[in-house]
Amino acid sequence: MKVFEAKTLLSEATDRAKEYKELRTQMVNLRKALKGVADLSDSEFSGKGASNIKAFYHDHVGVADQWIDYIDMKIAFFNSIAGAAEDKGLSDAYIEESFLEHELANANKKSKSIMSEQKKAMKDILNDIDDILPLDLFSTETFKDELADANDKRKKTLEKLDALDEDLKTEYALSEPNEQFIKSDFQKLQEATGKGKNATPIHYNAKAYRESDIHKKKGDIEKRTEAYLKIKKEEAKEREIEKLKERLKNYDYADADEFYEMAKTIGYENLTAEQQRYFTQIENTRELEAGFKGVAVGLYDSGKDAVVGLWDMVTDPGGTVEAITGAMAHPIKTYEAISAAIEESYQKDMVNGDTYSRARWVSYAVGTVVTSIVGTKGVGAVSKTGTAAKVTTKVKTAASKSATAQKAITVSKQTVDHIKQKVNTGIEVSKKHVKTKLNQIGDLTLADILPYHPRHDLVPAGVPYNAVNGVTLKEGLQKFAKVILPKPYGTSSSGRRTPAPHVPPVTVKYGEHFARWSRKKVLKPNIIYKTKEGYTYTTDNYGRITSVKADLQLGEAKRNQYAQTNAGKPQDRKPDDDGGHLIATQFKGSGQFDNIVPMNSQINRSGGKWYEMEQEWAKALSKKPPKKVAVQIEPVYSGDSLRPSYFDVTYKIGSRKEISVSIKNQPGG
């Protein structure tokens, strides 16, 4: 009979993991020493038998690698025991199986029997006095319910104990093939060294060892090990995320840095709306602080007529960062979104608002148009086009009875100079002021972060709402929004496209996911788009594909030779690269740039890891009936390169266990 004591088990697991870590350090040092001999140059070590000796040590390095992988599996296993026990609700339990199966089970039966006998005895008593004092017999329903719950808990505890025991034993056994392989493989290495007196490294036969049937299984063992370690890593991350999510439920947001780190670990998509808003505020503040000095100096050097307020930097990254970097910086800044938000605010504040909201809406709207969205276009541009003068004249005429209003909306030379002065002053504004502004954001809506949102220290105020044509003003805002949207992406010093700020991606229609940069078709940054087959793609702030999710379909799609030939050019494509399809055309994958990345030809073509993986998928889809093949592909990049360094792929065929592989973007994968 089993006895489960969580405290002892977890303590032993921690100790064993520590011992394996120490062993790993020793094995790494041994590997380093072996490799030191194997890598000796001919000038350092040559002569009769030198090549055999170096090959002998080189193959020992491979054996050491196998031991390190085996040790990593053991460490991952022992580190996961605490989480496995917690998943079953047994992290602090003490359980004697015999007590649950016998004593407690018997107690349950005995309790039922006792209650039944007592109820029968009471019934007899009540029957005897029924003619004198009729009484109802007490109900045993509550007792039965409580007893049933207790018995159910007993059974479930036994089930959890058995399941945990079986899971841990099964998982522990997963490393046994590695251990058996290492022993058998090492035996072959010894045999290749010679026999009897000739058993020395100088007689080592590397070819015999490397071509042995046992050694050829090395690749399969490595794949299994890699898959296991990846699963354990993901399990640990998921458990950490769940703990942090639980912690954030009642978090008081007092420590912004702590919250930010927890939220980054959890992932933006796993946060609540309130947490997402707070996370974005913190992230924008950090980006602003990091680039504060450079942005201010850059603005000063480029001319004092480029008016950009610091508050714009936080609330309107789509407008102000575009003016600085020349990039389409914020994904929600599309004409449809802006126009809809303008319409929404107009209906809310003008049509259905009160006196205050109408006056406020008109004041801010006029101020926005008068200054051509101060911080996005710049007062200098307004002065040159005469837009300010035209709008001012119209409103002055409409509000001729109000001298106060006329004075408030006049954009004079003094006003322009005042705004320019604010830019110079803004350069000196402290980070503390910016943080204070962020803390005042409160509950944001889409309207709050769009370009026409009020700039309290820049827009005119006091305009009488009843003297302005609100519909015309609304349409003017919408037209202006449309004008400022199309802006080219900038070019970095490395010749690549400049990135947009890091913001949550938004979904766009397929066909609207492309943009133009240097007369080339490129993907928009920070977006999610879906093909007609239902394949979903996500881009990062560089416009690179970072995720593809698909339930594959068998079929043929058109290839685009130009897209395949030019993927990653000119900076990032290597001579032996192909234009590799993330979702192959045999699965109806797009032949355009929205599905192609620079991919090493050896992994992409026949015999390569990527090719073989696709063949496995195609085979499953070709069966009758076809099996479901669900895949997720995540290209991982270094720096601002458009060429993935490697691909993390997770796929599931039918009811089989999910498989995770990592394929390096290099020969051999």
From Swiss-Prot:
Induction: Expressed on rich and minimal solid media likely in early stationary phase; dependent on DegSU. Not expressed in liquid LB, but only under conditions that promote biofilm formation. It comes from the Bacteria. Disruption phenotype: Deletion of the yeeF-yezG operon has no visible growth phenotype, however it is out-competed by wild-type cells. Keywords: Cell membrane, Coiled coil, DNA-binding, Hydrolase, Membrane, Nuclease, Toxin. The keyword RNA-binding does not apply. Residues 561-580 are annotated as: Disordered. Residues 1-235 form the LXG domain. It is found in: Cell membrane; Membrane raft. GO terms for molecular function: DNA binding; nuclease activity; toxin activity. GO terms for cellular component: membrane raft; plasma membrane. In the N-terminal section; belongs to the LXG family. This is Toxin YeeF. It comes from Bacillus subtilis (strain 168).
